[in-house]
Amino acid sequence: MESLLKLEHVTICYNGEPVVHDVGLELNKGEILGVVGESGSGKSTIIKAIMGLLGNEGMVTEGDIWYKGKNVVDMQEKELRRLLGPEIAMVFQNSGSALCPIRTVGDQIYESMREHERISRKECAERAVRMMAKIGLKDGERVLQSYPFELSGGMNQRVGICISMLQNPALLLADEPTSALDVTIQKQVVEEMLLMRKEYGTAMIIVTHNIGVVEKMADKVLVLKNGKVREYGKTAQVLTAPEDPYTKELMSSVLRLKRTGTGNGGR
């Protein structure tokens, strides 16, 4: 079976300086990969490269990123844009910053949906309100009529998650999707993302500091330090019996936090 996503010996540079070195990973339909590591380790850079969002300063200088057998690195911008939404969607760490401040949430959701499917504004609103309810946004009608600056950071985060989920992408890339949410809402979001995988076979890459989220969701884990892969394997193996010294140190620090009742599952 051909993998949905495959990175082969990928090196990424910003302004000529390597920030990710020789990374490889593979993801099949319905699989979830957790990417963990300290801040600045290159976690977010990898998913930005998959989306073609490295900006003018960033570039994949070595290796290939294959999506359904096509090399994303070689794609023209127009071809890549066709993938974004119905094929590949992203939840940003700060979804509020990705929303337009002078347009209502409803307008922005409708625009993102109609780019990829024929849908009426009414149907779009109904689907959005249902999705919002599932991830803890109870007053969906009011949210649709609001501007992003009228909502809290946690509410904007859930709006971003809602937009991504509504498009039922084959691949969902999530950068700290639960970081701005309280524990109860985190649980709802995680459960809804797992339901997406069950119903639609959605594959996911979850970038997070929260080891509890990885433990709950991920089939595989990739551990990064200074842009290099330190460990990559099945979740149970990496979390409970890591081989790399850095991973052992990371997991032991998480265990200490759990025992003392501080932290947020490794965050």
Please provide the spans of the model-predicted regions.
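The feature captures the beta-strand-to-loop junction immediately N-terminal to the Walker
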Residues: 36-38
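Conserved ABC transporter NBD signature motif
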Residues: 59-71
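A short, proline-enriched helix->beta-strand linker immediately N-terminal to the Walker B motif
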Residues: 166-170
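Helical segment within the ABC ATPase nucleotide-binding domain
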Residues: 187-200
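A short, surface-exposed alpha-helical micro-motif characterized by mixed small hydrophobic
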Residues: 214-216
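ABC ATPase "signature
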Residues: 229-233
